[in-house]
């Protein structure tokens, strides 16, 4: 965050944040409201939600949704972390792909016909068309997402400029702590759910406010969220579905429904299910997203209706600093998308999916807490933060 502010000289900082489920197909560790507090305490001025219909998608759709929201908020610069760290290399790679589009598409099809996943096929296709050191490594997850952010900016004819910060010391999927002060999200999550989990083990890798809020959430609600806690619901859901039912679920295609229904019969945990389900054709992340859609009962038709315009239909405001509130007050007449401070009275196909996702997310809670949290989510107004006193209002 501090590097972003230093690089962009920003007046205010806006974060677009996923809701209950994330792009890699996992439930968020804690609720979006706790994560909003974390962001505000770390210097973000406005926190807005990326709807489920975009946040649990491949990089291209995820980026389109995020950029459409930032564009509507009249953001002048976007900053993202990447393995490459050189913004000009992203633009060079986009230019090469555009010039070699016919060859690129042919190669992707060729590699997919050989049984590779779409992600692997595109990575291999890029290897074949990119020869210069001024191009990015498209096998790296943060490079891929950054590439799609810039493509979305160009596609949406936005005047937004892009900046990137190089990731170092740890990689996205690292499962262990390889540095004294920097760790991947994967390694932090693994530590939090380990047999001898302790918040003290991760305190040197995350901001103090974040560690405090994580501990507070676990104390107040008795848990942090991961896939294993939803496995019994997930298995029950699949046990009551036919292959035809499953085919209606978003991202279930090419006969995947038969493999899923077969593998669930002998699986006693989500991890063991995923280990038996994965193939060369489908990445772990791609399968996890499909599982998320099964869990939330999100159909192809629902996603089509929600994403028909290919941009976010509204802006759900989750939190703001005093500075962020001033920015919104000054610019609200220029912002074309409706800004939602709660969702109780607003109606849209995208929001229908969101409500289901929230219901599922809180399903692991005991009553009456579960009902209280669901009711509160629809009526919850944006969290306000006074950055001068470092206190929530």
From Swiss-Prot:
This is tRNA(Met) cytidine acetate ligase. Belongs to the TmcAL family. One of its GO terms (molecular function) is ATP binding. It is found in: Cytoplasm. Catalyzes the formation of N(4)-acetylcytidine (ac(4)C) at the wobble position of elongator tRNA(Met), using acetate and ATP as substrates. First activates an acetate ion to form acetyladenylate (Ac-AMP) and then transfers the acetyl group to tRNA to form ac(4)C34. The gene is tmcAL. It catalyses: cytidine(34) in elongator tRNA(Met) + acetate + ATP = N(4)-acetylcytidine(34) in elongator tRNA(Met) + AMP + diphosphate. Its EC number is 6.3.4.-.
